[in-house]
């Protein structure tokens, strides 16, 4: 797993991260100011106390079980085998899906390429078959050979890994429980049918990390962490709903659902309107349009396009090998996008730059100009957009301002802004009371 290797390497190099192998959480107790964990090791048990605990311990989360937290949602009938094999297979890099194959009637098979000549084969088990039966080596080998024969790739292969799983669309009702914050599969369980399993966990972490950092550093109020739960539970519900549709399409739970699915498949190559029924809806990014961190809703509605409050920034190509997000890079903190005309910075925009100059937390001001990049020490950096692509995609004109959270979701925007509005929007985006902002 390259991602895990890269993350582990980063953690090992970071002076503030301590990795403790071979240790298990066996107890958890919360107080008003800290959480105490009971840790079991080969050398005995000890206690570890921290201000906050982030539980990212997977679908079988020990922390979730110790806290007796129950998930809500649905578990679907049917069990599936995932088998990763190493083989030289001459097929393009795309996901192949087969419905009702001759060797596995009434079920389906997924096949797709992974790095280093690894191929993932995923198929549904016949009803009533146990996990032990499904993973019996001789039977598993016959089924993998049947898949390879079906795709006309009867090659030598080696089994890398195999397991059995069930499809679930389950989530906790909230992800923040006192000083314990749950994320990833510890907070929700999603089916694999295009439902962004690991991506959803990364989005959880991206949402939580900056908020926890702001609270720990005293830059934000503790209610900011409640917005993590609000936003990500809503995202989990959306993904569960879409994942449920995909799961019912892949494994119809009733004869009527199967009849509809088969009709869609049979007509899909000739009837264009049916393609929308097979669209991977979860490829759309989630937007936090109902977030309590968004400010100036009335002003946001004045726009006729662009990136609305709650939506993630759009990356715009400015020139060959030059994009808008390149200018933002990996800088931590809030971002202000200020759009200027050929005349450069106006008085209001200069006042906004001055008002955000010495905040306690990091904020980066990016000026977008249609002319050659300006030489202005107040901004970092300045982006030249001679083609006007950013102006068009952001429905911007000279004087337009976008306020962007550290996780790159827009939380306020104005056709014309003044310094007081920007500062008040920053207060709301850092967890201070709602309703403090002008409109």
Predicted regions and their residues:
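Core Rossmann-like FAD-binding/catalytic domain of the broad FAD-dependent monooxygenase superfamily
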Residues: 1-278, 283-287, 366, 436-439
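Helical substrate-recognition/capping region of FAD-dependent monooxygenase/halogenase enzymes
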Residues: 5, 9-14, 146, 214-439
């Amino acid at each position: 797993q390259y991602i895990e290797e890269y993350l582990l390497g980063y953690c090992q190099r970071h002076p503030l991260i301590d990795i403790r192998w071979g240790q298990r959480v066996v107890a958890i107790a919360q107080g008003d100011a800290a959480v105490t964990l009971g840790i079991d090791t080969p050398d005995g048990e000890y206690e570890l106390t921290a201000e906050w605990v982030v539980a990212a311990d997977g679908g079988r989360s020990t922390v979730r079980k110790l806290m007796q937290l129950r998930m809500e949602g649905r578990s679907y009938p049917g069990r599936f085998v995932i088998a990763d094999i190493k083989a030289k297979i001459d097929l393009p890099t795309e996901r192949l899906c087969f419905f009702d194959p001759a060797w596995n009637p009434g079920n389906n098979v997924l096949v797709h390429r992974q790095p280093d000549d690894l191929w993932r084969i995923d198929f549904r088990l016949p009803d009533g078959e146990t996990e032990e039966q499904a993973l019996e080596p001789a039977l598993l080998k016959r089924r993998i050979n049947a898949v390879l024969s079906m795709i006309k790739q009867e090659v030598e292969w080696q089994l890398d890994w195999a397991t059995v799983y069930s499809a679930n669309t389950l989530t906790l009702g909230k992800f923040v429980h006192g000083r314990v914050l749950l994320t990833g599969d510890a907070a929700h369980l999603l089916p694999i049918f295009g439902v962004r399993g690991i991506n959803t966990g990364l989005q959880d972490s991206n949402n939580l990390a900056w908020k926890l950092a702001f609270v720990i550093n005293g830059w934000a109020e503790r209610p900011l962490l409640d917005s993590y739960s609000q936003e990500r539970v809503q995202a989990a519900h959306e993904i569960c709903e879409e994942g449920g549709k995909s799961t019912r399409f892949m494994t119809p739970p009733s004869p009527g659902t199967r009849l509809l699915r088969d009709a869609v498949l049979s007509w899909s190559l000739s009837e264009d309107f049916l393609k929308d029924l097979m669209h991977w809806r979860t490829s759309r990014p989630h937007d936090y349009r109902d977030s309590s961190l968004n400010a100036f809703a009335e002003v946001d509605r004045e726009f006729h396009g662009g990136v609305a409050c709650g939506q993630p920034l759009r990356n715009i190509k400015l020139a060959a090998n030059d994009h808008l997000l390149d200018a933002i890079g990996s800088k931590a903190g809030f971002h202000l996008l200020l759009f200027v005309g050929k005349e450069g910075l106006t008085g209001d925009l200069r006042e906004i730059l001055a008002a955000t100059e010495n905040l306690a937390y990091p904020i980066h001001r990016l000026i977008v100009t249609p002319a050659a990049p300006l030489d202005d020490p107040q901004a970092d950096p300045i982006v030249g957009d001679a083609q006007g692509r950013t102006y068009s995609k952001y429905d911007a004109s000279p004087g337009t301002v976008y306020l962007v959270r550290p996780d790159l979701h827009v939380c306020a925007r104005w056709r014309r802004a003044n310094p007081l509005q920007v500062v008040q929007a920053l207060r709301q985006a850092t967890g201070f009371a709602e309703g403090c902002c002008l409109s």
